[in-house]
C-alpha cells in the first residue's frame, strides 16, 4: 500500500490539508504501507522554497514521517514525454481561444440554460487556421479529450459508489498557453510512475477523480483506490476571520499540542467519539477510514482547546522531559502534579517560577499573615501541612476557611487561583514560605 500527500508550496499548511495528510498517513501506517510526500510546484512563479521548508517542519511537528519525497519541478522531462505521447495517441489537443472568448462562450451557455462545458470547437480547426492564429501571436493551451460516452464509476472508501457522467465535464486544460502544466497531467503521471495504490483527498476533487481515472486509463495503468473526505466547516468567528481557514503556524502560536490537533482531526467527522490521546501509535492501530461520514464536519477551535489540556494530562514525564529541561524543570513529581492544572505547556514555567523564584507576594491582611507565619508547622512540608496550618490559624482567628485559603494563596503565590495549595506548598518549600510570609 502506498499513499501520497501532495501540497502546493504556495502558502502555509492549514487544518484542512493537514487533516488529509494525517488520514493518508494513518491509513497506510495502519496497513504497514508506505507514505510519499510530493510537492506540486510546477507553477514556479507561485511556488516558494520557503513554504517547502515550512511544510516539512509542520509535518514533522505533527508527527508525520515519510518514506520518500520529491518535487514535481524535478520531473518536467518526464511530464513532457507523457504529454507528447498523449498528443500522438489523440488524447490531447491544442486550443487557441483566449480567456475572453472562453468566458463569452461560458456565459452564453449559461444564459441558454446549458451547462458550461467546453464545446471542442478547437477540434474543428484546420491546419491553416491554426497557423493563422499562431501568426497573430496566439499561443495554444492544451486539453485532455475525455470519453464523453462513459459514466466513470468507482467505489469510494468514504462516499461509497460514485458515478460521474463525463458528458457534463469540460475537457480539462493540462497545459496553459504559457507552457506551465496544470495539476492534472503531472499528478496522474506521478501516481502511475510511483505506483500509488490509494489516494485520499477532499470531496472537492470528486470530478477531478473522474477525469484522472480516464487519464490513467489512457496511460494503460492500474486505477488506484480513492477516498474523498468531506470538507471542514469552520464555525468559530476567530477562524472565519482568518483567510483560508486556520493554518498550522497559528495553531503553534496558540500553543496547541501536536497530539491535541491529531486527536481532533483524525476523529472529526467519524462515528467515533473525539477523545484526547497522547499516543500516536494507538491512533494508528485503531484507525479505520470507513468510519468517516460522507457528511461535512464542523471544526471548533474551542473543542480543540479543551482537548489540549486533556492531552497534557495524559503525557508521561518521558514525553516532555526535554522540553522541561529547556525551562529548568527536572522534577517528574512536579510534572505529574502540574499537568492536571494547565491548559498550555507554557504554564509549567509560570508555576515553576512561582514555586522556586522570587515573587511579589500579595498581602491582603498583614495581621493575619503575621499570625499565619507564627502558626506554620515545624518540619518539611507534606500533604498534611496545609490542613494542620489552617487548623492552628483558625484556633486563633475567627475566619472562614475559604477566605483563609485565599489569603494564604495570595501571600505565597501572588495569585488568587491555581493548583491545589496543599501540594503546591511541597514544591514551594519551607524556606520560600518563610521568606514570603516574613517579607511583609
UniProtKB/Swiss-Prot annotation:
Task: Name the residues that bind ATP.
Answer: 241
- Keywords in alphabetical order, please: Aminoacyl-tRNA synthetase, ATP-binding, Cytoplasm, Ligase, Nucleotide-binding, Protein biosynthesis
- Positions of short motif 'HIGH' region: 7-17
- Its EC number is 6.1.1.17
Subcellular locations according to the entry: Cytoplasm
Q: Which Pfam families match?
A: Anticodon_2, tRNA-synt_1c
Q: Which reaction does it catalyse?
A: tRNA(Glu) + L-glutamate + ATP = L-glutamyl-tRNA(Glu) + AMP + diphosphate
Gene Ontology BP annotations: glutamyl-tRNA aminoacylation
Q: What is its main location?
A: cytoplasm
Q: Tell me the domain of life.
A: Bacteria
GO molecular-function term, one example from the UniProt record: glutamate-tRNA ligase activity
| Annotated motif 'KMSKS' region, positions | 238-242
GO (cellular component) term, any one: cytoplasm
Family per record:
Belongs to the class-I aminoacyl-tRNA synthetase family. Glutamate--tRNA ligase type 1 subfamily.
Q: How does it assemble?
A: Monomer.
What PANTHER family is this protein classified in?
Answer: GLUTAMATE--TRNA LIGASE, GLUTAMATE--TRNA LIGASE, MITOCHONDRIAL-RELATED
Q: What does this protein do?
A: Catalyzes the attachment of glutamate to tRNA(Glu) in a two-step reaction: glutamate is first activated by ATP to form Glu-AMP and then transferred to the acceptor end of tRNA(Glu).
Q: What is this protein called?
A: Glutamate--tRNA ligase 2
